[in-house]
Amino acid sequence: MIPSTISLSAFRPEHLEGALRLSRQAGWPHRLEDWQMALDLSAGFVAMAANASTVLGTVLMTPYKRDVATINMVIVDEAARGRGLGRQLMKAVTTLAGSRALRLIATGEGLPLYQKLGFCRAGTIVQHQGQVLHVAPPTKARPAESRDIFGILELDRSAYGADRRDLLRTLAKVGQLAVLCNGQGLTGFAALRRFGRGEVIGPVVATNADDGKALLAYFMAEREGRFVRVDTAESSQLGAWLADRGLVRVDEGIAMQRPVVARSSCAPLTTFALASQAFG
């Protein structure tokens, strides 16, 4: 039960500064612009201190049409923990998500709560970042053109299992897209945008690891000495390749789903890097 001095309300733009305070307290790299993008694509709640109008907790739900949603930006102020705020925020946002299948990336600290709410482990997500070393430019990737967007949407839908057109159109506006072609059509794509301390590459979708590396290399080759982040599934086995190019492993999270949806072992496309831990 929420203490009488704290209330939940819809997450609105006027709460962004308070949310930024919480993410900085948690040691997250998000800028105000990163929070704004998350809110533009999402809906959610804040826990507010009734007397001081202080944001004490946040949660967002990013819907991908009516089938899937990610739960993200779950933060509770250090001074307000132990009161059940995390549980109340999660209950509110899962109700908001309705019948959608839910996905999230958990910290070890949040894992017990998510398990109690019916989420199950679905893998490990590894955060790589650092200053890019010299990377040779690939020969088979090119900048995306406006006519490529429909093919990109289909590639992502096949790899992710949901329609993320709003996210991808936003990435096309605020960042850059690159694609791979085989002469008959698109076979992979990657996105890059400003985020946190520098830039993030993702999503990266391809048919095999070599193509995934080529798409990553396309953006990394132009960014020697600059700070770049990549979030990838541990199962992608890109860790050593990224570390050799300056992006070292610094953290990891636990991918969780409710309900668990098994990925086909013969699926033609793989997501080699996430758009972010918030967006999947």
For each predicted feature, which ranges?
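Active-site-proximal cofactor/substrate-binding loop regions of enzyme domains
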Residues: T5-S99, A106
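Conserved active-site tyrosine of GNAT-family acetyltransferases
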Residues: Y114-F119, L242
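Intrinsically disordered, low-complexity, positively biased terminal segments
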Residues: I2, R12-P13, E17, M37, ...
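Central beta-strand plus flanking loop segment that forms part of the substrate or channel wall
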Residues: V126-G130, M256
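Conserved N-terminal entry element of GNAT/NAT acetyltransferase domains
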Residues: M1-P13, Q131-S146
